[in-house]
């Protein structure tokens, strides 16, 4: 059974005001779940307490906060299990509507390429597929492309790209399968939310899907649409462009 814990994070001890209603939506719709919020300092302490020196070195070397947050979310769910949700996700119904008693891993597909999204997911502790994701982060960190700062998409490498690499590797899937079958290829192994209305994100609009009364999770894509009182990771990435020479 996936533990009834909701995990969220932001750089400071206090989340941005724009996230207040979203946080409330998760606790209101899931009163039987524990809620856990971690600042950057708390995330760093967790990584330091639970992982080995190589993993800590990788984590500390990441130059942009969102990259560390991407690693932390996989690490915290691997260690304790539960639900991870970005602060810019609104919960519109109980998690029990999309997490079954026998589920061990629940993920969603971001787009037609079959990339696994990491803005929301749920798993039991020590799930081997999540461990594979953590291994993929180490492999990316140790690659010549990353070490020589030649990656054109360093943030994505530790986001949906790295996440998908780990999941694909664990389940023995490959890109041609995913391109042909989309998210259906994953359903042999884990519950995958494919309905872009039930799990709505900004990309869904491009695919002519819109949120309605059946939408359970609404990803508001803060890095694009939130402005006042919220600093997008995209701005931090712009300040750090020289780090990767892109």
Which residues fall in each region the model found?
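Glycosyltransferase-associated regions of secretory-pathway enzymes
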Residues: 1-69, 85-246
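Small-residue hinge/turn detector
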Residues: 70-82
């Amino acid at each position: 059974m996936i533990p009834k814990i909701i995990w969220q994070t932001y750089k400071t001890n206090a989340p941005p005001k724009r996230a207040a209603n979203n946080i409330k939506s998760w606790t209101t719709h899931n009163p039987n779940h524990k809620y856990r919020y971690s600042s950057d300092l708390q995330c760093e302490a967790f990584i330091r307490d639970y992982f080995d020196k190589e993993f800590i070195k990788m984590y500390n070397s990441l130059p942009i906060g969102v990259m560390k947050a991407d690693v932390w979310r996989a690490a915290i769910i691997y260690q304790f299990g539960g639900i991870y949700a970005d602060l810019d996700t609104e919960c519109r119904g109980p998690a029990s509507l999309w997490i079954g008693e026998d589920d061990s891993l629940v993920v969603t597909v971001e787009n037609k390429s079959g990339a696994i999204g990491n803005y929301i997911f749920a798993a039991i502790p020590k799930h081997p597929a999540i461990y594979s994701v953590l291994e993929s982060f180490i492999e990316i960190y140790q690659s010549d492309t990353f070490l020589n700062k030649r990656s054109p998409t360093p943030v994505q490498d530790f986001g949906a790209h790295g996440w998908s690499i780990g999941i694909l590797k664990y389940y023995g899937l490959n890109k041609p399968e995913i391109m042909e079958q989309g998210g259906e290829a994953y359903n042999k192994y884990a519950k995958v939310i494919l309905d872009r209305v039930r799990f709505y994100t900004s990309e869904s609009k491009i695919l002519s899907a819109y949120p309605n009364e059946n939408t359970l999770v609404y990803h508001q894509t803060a890095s694009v649409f939130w402005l006042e009182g919220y600093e997008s990771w995209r701005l931090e990435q712009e300040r750090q462009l020289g780090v990767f020479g892109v």
